[in-house]
Amino acid sequence: WMVALFGIVVGPLVVISIYFIIIQPIAIGTYCTICLLAAAAMLIMIPFSLDEIVAMLQFMVWNTRRGRPFWRAFFRGDALPGSSKGGTMSFDAHPREIARQSARGVTVPWTLGVSAAIGLFLMLSRAIFDNALPLAGSDHLVGALVLTTAVIAWAEVARPFRFLNIGFGLWLIVAPWVLGGGTIAGSLIGVLSGVALLGLTLPRGKRNAEHYGSWDRYIV
């Protein structure tokens, strides 16, 4: 139940909070630096928690299928046949070792790193290229969504989530032709960013040596 509660707090609630922060400049016409920093802090928590949530769901399914009471296992825990205890770590462990263990289910392929950078760049297009609404609002919104999608996909169990950026890339290509307010440079950069996202999204990127049971087949 602790993992489930943590997943609810870090998953849906964080995504909703990030969404409201994303639309803030569009709704009120100004940026809030503290709000953006808060959104970044919340966003970075998501990929580090997803593998634990997937493991919890898998355990509950497998344990229930073998006839064990669902709610008893949910609140009090249980063990699958043949399972073993994980490695222990002392409280005085080196910070580097703690960070390494925390990031076991997270990898950052260069394709997703560049995708995140493109998203961040698009969020600043209004200031850099002097774009005006409605294109400036579109670039900010899509850029924030691209950044959020790429960072969530750093979690290996959520790697297929990156395919959402294909839709965002297609919109970036179309947006300058259907929305006004863009400068020539800003519109051109938006189109090129969309094309780049299409190419960057297709490769899965590197994986580490970790395996996630039956979830491995979904990591494409």
Regions of interest found by a model, annotated:
Residues I23-T30, V174-V191:
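Membrane-helix boundary connector in multi-pass membrane proteins
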Residues R100-L112, L133-P134, V151-F161, A185:
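Short, recurring structural edge motifs at helix starts
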Residues V3-G7, D139, P160-L170:
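Cytoplasmic-side transmembrane-helix entry/capping segments in multi-pass membrane proteins
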Residues T111-N131, L145-V146, A150-A153, N165-G182, ...:
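Extracellular/lumenal glycan-associated surfaces
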Residues D130-G143, L188-V191:
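Structural signature of hydrophobic alpha-helical transmembrane segments
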Residues W1-G113, I118-L120, L124-S125, L200-V220:
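Secretory/periplasmic and organellar redox-cofactor proteins
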Residues M2-G11, E97, P134, S138, ...:
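Compositionally biased, low-hydrophobicity segments enriched in charged and small polar residues
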